Amino acid sequence: MQEERSEKKIGPFKFQSNFEWKEFPQEEFEWFVKEVEKRFGLNLSSYKPQRVKRRTELLLRKYNVGYREYLNMLIKDKKYLDEFMDKMTINVTEFFRNPEKWWELRDEIIPLIAKNSLRMKFWSAGCSSGEEPYSLAILVHELNLSYKTRILATDIDIGVLRRAQEGIYEERAFVSTPKEYLEKYFEKLPDGRYRIKDSVKKIVEFKRHDLLKDPFEKNFDLIVCRNVVIYFEPEAKNELYRKFAESLKPGGFLFVGNTERIFNYKELGFEIYKPFIYRKVK
């Protein structure tokens, strides 16, 4: 039983300052997951359940509320919904993460695509705050191929997409970025942050997209989806890889994170082109 001893008010909501914390029954968590999908379209059941439960209950502890009270907060105030979406999705990234793999794209894979394509179509799936698609765009500029390239960048989280479109980053996002790229493609702001130049931004199109629910575009030459799929349940992972394969042109490439492997890649019509880079052969 929860005892209400005193309350504090934040915005329109009252929070119990002496909330008696308890472990919530599993059925309350499952109810919450279903309500979130029904009301907001976020399918949490395809994520690893312990990760979702842990992150949600950290927010419940923060506000000293239960699942039902918290759902009411999400419905009535977009600020809490944005915070929840940010906690549930994966938004930790940097420019040129695992740089040796990006140099393989620059030196071999993108030139190979360009040789065989009049127009190049790339997709950064689960793009977070934009570091990944902008990394791609920088490589395209370095190869003087921006005139024939379109980069689609998608994420489920509207908040991070807004940050991506703004294109302003803290210095810590550039730990793997060559100095010449930083000087050539970014403008340093008075507060020490960096803003991506418009010449890079203009070939990237940002769009909200739910990998688990929304239809996929077709005929991509390259799909980059790194450190996103690891958070999904095995069934959802397999379905995503199948849909990525269907979205690629024959000969197209799928670039995944350095902790991700597609064990049934042959069944999906892939070959291992390089470690963590798969090529569609069917």
UniProtKB/Swiss-Prot annotation:
Keyword S-adenosyl-L-methionine: yes
One Pfam family here: CheR
Keyword presence, Transferase: yes
Protein name (Swiss-Prot/TrEMBL): Chemotaxis protein methyltransferase
CDD domains per UniProt: AdoMet_MTases
Organism: Thermotoga maritima (strain ATCC 43589 / DSM 3109 / JCM 10099 / NBRC 100826 / MSB8)
Gene from which this protein is expressed: cheR
Residue span, CheR-type methyltransferase domain: 17-282
Taxonomic path: Bacteria, Thermotogati, Thermotogota, Thermotogae, Thermotogales
Function summary: Methylation of the membrane-bound methyl-accepting chemotaxis proteins (MCP) to form gamma-glutamyl methyl ester residues in MCP.
